[in-house]
């Protein structure tokens, strides 16, 4: 019987989802992206070769897998063609194995221009977007003025819609933000030059998935960013513009929610965050700097340094609630090697003295929050590339077990290095 498994970030993104998607892809027929855009950098290291995929599902490196981009994904034609070109130059057949929903909103140059203009205007209060036009494209979707992949089939109608929407954007860019307008003809010409390639990959994603389920095929849904960046449930307004939680699978692909069998939450052995927003366990000392150095904590897309802190079970409990997480995959366990002690945040002390075990929702409610830590003995032994759980140091095993206890969710997969072979599968998600 076929299983449908969701892989998503249970923290603030950058948890190592790409590697785990790639690891489990040899079990499946389809890998599906259901939200986000090319703001998500999924890094894969296979036999020492590094690949960063931003828009195309990570399953593309497996020749027998079909990759689907669902309606919840915002698609930049330029970014898509660039990524396709990079993969095809390595002999990977993309357009024969990539299918796209016609309902995907398009990201066009005016979205990027607006993204940059807004962040510049906000100055120090900037949200910290990737500047790739993701938010403005989602805005257009909700406002029902956006252009979609399906609009590329009718080039005359597309040109007229583009003209109208550019008038709307250029008025704001010029008169409010005092920046240069976006050129209509260049935008139109650039999109039309690649329109036929994109429309050639359009398919009914919902029907494909439903048929696969009925035929007993395994399906893997690949999330982007992380739970605490969800537009509705994250640390608003320091969030992304899509639903990064498991509910986004149904709305972003058209796959019925009752058909999901297992949700794998990816967690680092510590926490990181990029950009602004609350981060209760953030470390500003030498320990934080050492975690960042050992973990090579720089964004795959932006290159920005990530903020680092101890493992936050309070935020994770909220992620468990929001996603119905079946099991965890813990990544970067080896980064904690060598520390005298390691800490787990088990509760928050609110400004009024109240002790809470679940993270607040809005960013404003995190102000003045203090972490309450449990301190455990660290381990000096090297766990890098260990693939036998029985060979892990006892203090490391104790740390893992304690995280399972304070969260109530089993750790089903352990990752001890960037390559997909440097992994221990303790419970198989597709057999759970």
From Swiss-Prot:
Binding site for GTP: 13-19, 41-43, 306, 332-334, 415-417
Note on how the cofactor is bound: Binds 1 Mg(2+) ion per subunit.
UniProt-annotated binding residues for substrate: 300-306
GO-annotated cellular components: cytoplasm
Chain segments annotated as coiled-coil in the UniProt record: none
InterPro entries tied to this protein: Adenylosuccin_syn_GTP-bd, Adenylosuccin_syn_Lys_AS, Adenylosuccinate_synth_dom1, Adenylosuccinate_synth_dom2, Adenylosuccinate_synth_dom3, Adenylosuccinate_synthetase, P-loop_NTPase
CDD domains: AdSS
Cofactor or coenzyme needed: Mg(2+)
Biological pathway: Purine metabolism; AMP biosynthesis via de novo pathway; AMP from IMP: step 1/2
Keyword Isomerase attached: no
Gene3D superfamilies from the UniProt entry: Adenylosuccinate Synthetase, subunit A, domain 1, Adenylosuccinate Synthetase, subunit A, domain 2, Adenylosuccinate Synthetase, subunit A, domain 3
Catalytic reaction annotation: IMP + L-aspartate + GTP = N(6)-(1,2-dicarboxyethyl)-AMP + GDP + phosphate + 2 H(+)
Cellular compartment(s): Cytoplasm
Pfam families per UniProt: Adenylsucc_synt
Purpose: Plays an important role in the de novo pathway of purine nucleotide biosynthesis. Catalyzes the first committed step in the biosynthesis of AMP from IMP.
Alphabetical list of HAMAP family matching this protein: Adenylosucc_synth
The protein's assembly and partners: Homodimer.
Entry protein name: Adenylosuccinate synthetase
Species of the source: Haemophilus influenzae (strain ATCC 51907 / DSM 11121 / KW20 / Rd)
């Amino acid at each position: 019987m076929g299983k449908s498994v969701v892989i998503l970030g249970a923290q603030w993104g950058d948890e190592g989802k790409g590697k785990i998607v790639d690891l489990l892809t040899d079990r499946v027929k389809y890998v599906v992206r259901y939200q986000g855009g090319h703001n998500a950098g999924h890094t894969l290291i296979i036999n020492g070769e590094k690949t960063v995929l931003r828009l195309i599902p990570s399953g593309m490196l497996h020749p027998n897998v079909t990759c689907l981009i669902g309606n919840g994904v915002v698609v930049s034609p330029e970014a898509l063609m660039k990524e396709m070109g990079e993969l095809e130059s390595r002999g990977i057949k993309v357009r024969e194995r990539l299918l796209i929903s016609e309902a995907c909103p398009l990201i066009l140059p005016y979205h990027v221009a607006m993204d940059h203009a807004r962040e510049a205007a906000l100055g120090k209060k900037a949200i910290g977007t990737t500047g790739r036009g993701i938010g403005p494209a989602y805005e257009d979707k909700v406002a029902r003025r956006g252009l979609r992949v399906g609009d590329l089939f009718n080039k005359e109608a597309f040109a007229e819609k583009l003209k109208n929407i550019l008038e709307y954007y250029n008025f704001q860019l010029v008169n409010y933000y005092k920046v240069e307008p976006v050129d209509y003809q260049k935008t139109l010409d650039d999109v039309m030059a690649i329109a036929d390639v994109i429309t050639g990959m359009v398919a009914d994603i919902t029907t494909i998935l439903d048929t696969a389920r009925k035929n007993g095929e395994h399906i893997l849904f690949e999330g982007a960013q992380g739970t605490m960046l969800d537009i509705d449930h994250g640390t608003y307004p320091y969030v992304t513009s899509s639903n990064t939680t498991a509910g986004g699978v149904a709305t972003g692909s058209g796959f019925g929610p009752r058909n999901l069998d297992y949700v794998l939450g990816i967690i680092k052995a510590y926490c990181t965050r990029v950009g602004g927003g609350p981060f209760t366990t953030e470390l500003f000392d030498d320990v934080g700097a050492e975690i960042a150095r050992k973990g090579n904590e720089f964004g795959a897309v932006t290159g920005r340094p990530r903020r680092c802190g101890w493992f936050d079970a309070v935020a994770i409990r909220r992620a468990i609630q929001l996603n119905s997480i079946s099991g965890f995959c813990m990544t970067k366990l080896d980064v904690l090697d060598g520390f005298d002690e390691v800490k787990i945040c088990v509760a928050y002390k609110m400004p009024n003295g109240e002790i809470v075990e679940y993270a607040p929702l809005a960013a404003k409610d995190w102000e003045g929050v203090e972490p309450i830590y449990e301190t455990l003995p660290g381990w000096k032994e090297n766990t890098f590339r260990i693939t036998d759980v029985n060979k892990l140091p006892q203090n490391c095993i104790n740390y893992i077990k304690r995280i399972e206890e304070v969260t109530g969710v089993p750790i089903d997969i352990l990752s001890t290095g960037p390559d997909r072979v440097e992994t221990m599968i303790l419970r198989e998600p597709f057999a759970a």
